[in-house]
Regions:
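Flavin-dependent oxidoreductase catalytic cores
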Residues: 1-326
Length: 326
């Protein structure tokens, strides 16, 4: 089998393998990014950050920009509706953080974002995509990338949008295989992703959406034509998937899934890092929402999930996970 797990370049930044952790709001903070990195992710992308939050020195926003040692290469994703504001925020990030890459969100489908003329709203207008990327790219020395969807209501502009981004100067493009209207329903549109992969001739293309197994990851490379796979929801509760994909790309061998005990060890490590980042009260509250992902597919999950949802301290969760000595 040909080794698919070779490094690739985003601008002047070398990504050591073909797996990327997608940005996910409320999930891909430094606590989870460091775990994903240790378990094989070649590049990790920060949860989306508001350009206005940076502009107004919002304390919560600035705290989100924290990058731990060992995360690099890492990317910070920005969202916003005004190209001048986005450019100022990108410049601030370049000068004040340890990021290697800046990414622009052109795919978020949630109403709160699109009502503010940001995220997936841009998918309606390739000219605006070009204008915004061209402006932001002009103030940066580090690579600029973009993450988008196949379209707003349909994928008719997918290739045109991608080519506009490429012409404007992005160093890589990631695309989720659903339209904004689909949200997260239905299936990723692999035919459209393939068309985009063929159209982009100067930059790497990252395929995103419905990559839950090593075989699906391989399909995105070999059949869709992507240069790398970007994994979001499937990595929640199973960041070991990055290691499985890397191993499969190198050897063709499928590593077995982790045992329940090993999954709980990762979950516990995730919680401890959240506590270091945000303090016990906030971390435990957030972990209650993350725990169901780690418990997916395990016997007795409902009972344990219910118990964790009532926990309010690290000690309680340690007891429930039976990892008191971890």
């Amino acid at each position: 089998m040909t080794n698919l797990n070779t490094p690739f370049m985003i601008g002047n930044v070398e990504i050591p393998n073909r797996t990327v952790l997608a940005p996910m709001a409320g999930v891909t903070n430094s606590a989870f990014r460091t775990i994903a990195k240790e378990l094989g992710a070649g590049l990790v992308v920060m949860e989306m950050v508001s350009d206005k939050g940076i502009q107004y020195n919002n304390e919560k926003t600035l705290h989100m920009l924290h990058i731990d040692e060992g995360e690099n290469p890492v990317s910070i994703q920005l969202f916003g509706s005004d190209e001048d504001s986005l450019a100022r925020a990108a410049e601030f990030i370049q000068e004040n953080t340890k990021t290697d890459i800046v990414d622009i969100n052109m795919g978020c489908p949630v109403n709160k974002i699109v009502k503010n003329e940001a995220g997936a709203m841009w998918l309606k207008d390739p000219d605006k995509i070009y204008s915004i990327i061209n402006k932001v790219q002009s103030v940066l020395d580090i690579p600029l990338t973009v993450k988008m969807r196949t379209g707003w209501a349909d994928p008719s502009l997918a290739v045109e949008n991608a080519l506009a981004a490429e012409a404007a100067g992005v160093s890589a493009l990631a695309m989720h295989g659903r339209t904004r209207e689909q949200m997260y329903t239905g299936h990723a549109d692999l035919e459209t992703l393939h068309k985009v992969a063929q159209a982009l001739t100067k930059i790497p293309f990252l395929a995103n959406g419905d990559i839950r197994t090593v075989q699906e990851a391989k399909q995105r490379i070999e059949e869709v034509g992507a240069d790398a796979v970007m994994i979001g929801r499937a990595a929640m509760g199973n960041p070991y998937l990055f290691n499985q994909i890397n191993h499969y790309f190198e050897t063709g061998e499928i590593l077995p899934d982790l045992t329940f005990e090993d999954k709980m060890k990762i979950a516990y490590e995730h919680l401890k890092r959240l506590i270091d980042l945000k303090g016990e009260n906030v971390a435990v509250r957030e972990f209650r929402g993350l725990a169901p992902h780690y418990l997916r597919g395990t016997s007795g999950a409902a009972k344990l999930r219910g118990a964790i949802s009532q926990a309010s301290t690290l000690a309680e969760i340690e007891s429930l996970l039976q990892l008191d000595k971890a």
